[in-house]
Structure formats: C-alpha cells, structure tokens
Amino acid sequence: MVAVNDRVKETTTTTGTGTVNLAGAAVGFETFVAGIGNGNTTYYCIAEQGGAAFEIGIGTVTDATPDTLSRTTVLSSSNSDSLVDFAAGTKDVFCTLPASKAVIEDASNNVNIGSNIIVGGTVDGVDIATRDGVLTVSYTHLRAHET
C-alpha cells in the first residue's frame, strides 16, 4: 500500500540517480518520516529549483541520519520517464498524488476503474465475497433488498 499525506516537503542536494538524502522539512511542512513514516512507500516528486528537471515516482522512506527516500519506480520524468541524473544544486522533494494514479469522478458522476477493486466490508450494505476470482453475492441477501 502506498501512503500519501498533505504538506510533506523537504529539500535535497543529492546528485545522480540513487537514493536521495533528505535535508529536513521546508518551512510550514513536515518531513517524510513524520508525514509518511519509516519503511513506508509513497508517491514523490523531485523538482530542480530554478530548472526543468523533475521526476515523479514511487519511493520508500527510511528514518536514518540523514533520512532518505529511495527511488523505486519512475512514473514520469523530464528524462523520458526514466530516472533523472540530477546535477548539483537544490531540489524540492515532496509527496504528491500523480494524475495517472488518481481516481476521478467524471462529469456524469461515474468512476471508471481499469483494474481490480479490493473491498473490505460491504458495498451499499450488501456483503460481497470473492470465490475463485469471481464476484459472488448471496441470492437471498439480494432478494431481501428488493422488498
């Protein structure tokens, strides 16, 4: 599971394509360790201050000295959607929700899901179970909702 949180932002001066050393929270924000948690994965953006280089991906937060963010999977970047070889200078590193991962309600109030849905509990009060990869619902439970 990927963790996300509002107002998580730090800076880094790390160069290259490896794990990023985090330099502390920007004013008014919290650190990745505080906002996401040690060992958790999150969506991130690294953006070069005053430049065009950027990377959006999935990474893992580590509580260390200094705290780090590993760059596990790149979703998009200024380097043809590959790891960016960041040059010297300060970069902003922040938690984000990539557009490609967002679930959006369209103008007709529909939500289209392109893959699997994991439900724990009920949907509109109906218990749902899966068996052999097929969605099944108790017939008597459905009949009870008709009256």
Which positions does each model-derived feature cover?
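Conserved small/polar residues in nucleotide/adenosyl-binding loops
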Residues: T140-T147
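Low-complexity, small-hydrophobic/phenylalanine-enriched stretches
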Residues: K101-V123, I128-L135, L142
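Intrinsically disordered, low-complexity, compositionally biased regions/tails
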Residues: V20-L22, G28, D63, I118, ...
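Generic alpha-helical propensity signal that fires on short helical segments
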Residues: N79, A87, A129, L135-T136
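N-terminal assembly/attachment segments of tailed bacteriophage virion structural proteins
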Residues: M1-S100
